[in-house]
Amino acid sequence: MLLSKKISNFVKHKGIKPNSAIMKKVILTLSVMSATLSAQAQLQTNNGIEYLQCQARDMSGDFSDLANTYFLADSITGFDFNKGEGLLNWKRYRLAPRQAFNLNGYWPVRMKMLDFPDTQYDNDPNLKIRIQKIDDRTLRVTLFTSPVEPKMDEANDPMFSPEFIAESLGNGDARLARGRWNTSADNSRIIYQNRNGVLEIQKYPFRLILKDANGKILTQTRHIIDNDSTQVKLLPFNFIKRGSDNSRSINPVFLLSPGERIYGCGESFTSLNKVGQKVNLSVVDPQGPETDGMYKPVPFYFSNRGYGIFMHTSAPATADFGASYIGAQRLFMGDETMDFFVFFGEPKQILNEYTNVTGKSPMLPLWTFGTWMSRISYFSQKEGLEIAHQLRANRIPADVIHFDTGWFGVDWQCDYQFAKDRFKDPVGMLKTLKKDGFHTCLWQLPYFTPKNRYFKELVAEGMAVRNGNGTLNYEDAVLDLSNPKTVTWYQDKIAHLIKQGVSAIKCDFGEAAPYDGLYASGKTGFYEHNLYPLRYNKALWEAVKANSPEQEGVIWARSAWAGSQRYPLHWGGDAATNEVGSVGMMGDLRGGLSFGLSGFSFWSHDMGGFVTQSPDDLYRRWLPFGFLSSHTRAHGAPPTEPWLISKDFTDAFRANAEMKYQLMPYVYAQAKDCSEKGLPMVRALFVEFPHDAGAWLVEDEYMYGSQILVAPLLESGTDRSVYLPKGKWIDYQNGKVYEGGYQHISVAEHKIPCVILVRDGSLIPQVPVAQSTDKIQWNQISWKPFKADASQCVGYLYKPGDKEITIIKQ
């Protein structure tokens, strides 16, 4: 029934005079009710998505909601260089429906506020913009959407590295000394400039313009006037105030240039180049590396045009890189503040700068680079010792035995105690394994089922995440790792295991922190969900390191967020084992490359896949990829152990393991270099060859460190096409020389079924094969030159106990 008819019937029924004061109140009341109902209906349509539990949030929908108010960045109204602060004027808009030739759409149109009392609010607010000099390649740009700045406890921000906090936040003089930027201004612009780049702030129309040192525009923000020349009325740089609750979220919009390519965003399993994709930066359990979900999203990316951006936030965000409009990067952020770190340079320089802010991966103990043997799961002391015995009996070099979900009294029931009936003497077992060169890793998770022995304690002591009613969000108790009391409790449990002789702890899960939970930090899951893996990684890493002999322990984690690279290492999750298409293997390769382009030096994956028994051919092709990754693990549904498959497969497995152990001096030196510079061990070709246009197109090959190129066989067969950057490349296995460009290479006669090529002019260190890394004979290093046109060969050496890398020339 129409509102007018409802009012008419109501008036007649009550006998109210048409122009009376009562009549005016009735009309006002019913109008408010109508508007409220309309808003609710609109919210249900545009903003009322019912997400599955812990499903990735797509924040873009909030920026097309007709119930919201839109504020468009318009002009700078003042700026103080001494403070690095100014005021940015935002114009108030709404989205207005428009019909043209039977096509319905909506355009942003100017709006006069209806807020009351109207003298107390600004129709077009002036809000703070702040620029900070961080380093000579890094600037920090912060825009606020409220006159009240949100509390930013940066000294305790888990995303920032301790070094960044100490040097850049704690000591302003040190920061300014590093961040040498020349500043200037005129009537139309504000400029920060040095030899590496330019940030130009155009006053009106407001734009943030990034330029290279020569003045070439790299990207810039969009203004409403950019819509004048197009029928597509794209929302420019804006923030919203929601009609539902007045909460705010910001939407920076940047130019996306022809030929531009975007990389990063975490361990993404889709195409490396994110242009054309819509990336949801929300931690999820994607159930494997075959979808667009991510265990390890990272709100950082960079462009082939020479700039990078770190969105300093833990709120969910959606990055639309030309998916909805081919000329724009649309960053739909859940946060109400835009806090961006902007980097200038080539990929290596940008990765170094980004990891200066969020931290670099520390150098890891030598034993971690050896073979990790596992399955889901070994259930007893006897079984673990037998696996170790078989590895040595079959002469397969290995350093780690991992016990997955089955070491507790009840499978999957994490209580931090070895099952007494199946592990008669766990400490003795750990000592026996260590004596034979094996370190031990144990599985655990941060969720506690109602039947877990610790469930009631966690709930009673307030150590689990709670909902608004004070009860649990789920049936399980999820550790609230923003609570120092919980962290202490958790670390005590881990410390007991490390003191017994365990060397590594598997940091499984961590993706299901409730979005609607209330946390001890005082924040909701909107800000804590993505932070959860980082807090989880940190708590476990600290417990393992603090209680390990010589602080040599590590973690083995599945989930991550920006800053988690400080707590290595991570693996690629539960890969599919389907042979046709090798989808799991392809997803892992893309994920590892993308992860490395997001600031993580070390990474692994389950060779052969995880879900079911790996087909023989798939497992064989996966082996070289696994052993030529920074870290190597066989894990998944049994059998993963080669001797349980066949003698021929055992020989193949051994050959791959021996190759890596021979290369361990190379691996160790490259790892050290990566840890110092924020570089990945498994790196996309363009990181090493940024001026080779073809290198930017390749996503099924990688550089293993700086000198070895690896192209796995992603399909059945013995040959494949590869792209080689300019120069000569020498086959690691037979010495054949290849020219740069596209080549079709056969490995039919190779012992290792993989294309492995060495860069011309490389000097590769090798050692005799050892059965474990503690038996490596570092005094017997030989140097193998790979030389075609090069006049000199260069190699790198870093031995355990060394302080720095030594450059060797021959």
Language model features with spans:
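Bacterial Sec-dependent N-terminal signal peptides
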Residues: 1-44
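N-terminal accessory segment at the very beginning of proteins
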Residues: 41-357, 362, 366-367, 376, ...
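An acidic- and aromatic-residue-enriched active-site/binding cleft used to recognize and process polar
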Residues: 136, 144-146, 195-197, 204-206, ...
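Beta-sheet entry/capping signal
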Residues: 138-139, 189, 198, 207, ...
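Aromatic- and carboxylate-enriched substrate-binding clefts and catalytic-loop regions
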Residues: 160-172, 220, 229, 397-653, ...
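Conserved, mostly hydrophobic/aromatic
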Residues: 300, 391, 433, 540, ...
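Short, acidic/polar
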Residues: 380-393, 487-496
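Catalytic core of carbohydrate-active enzymes
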Residues: 542-547, 552-553, 560-572, 590-591, ...
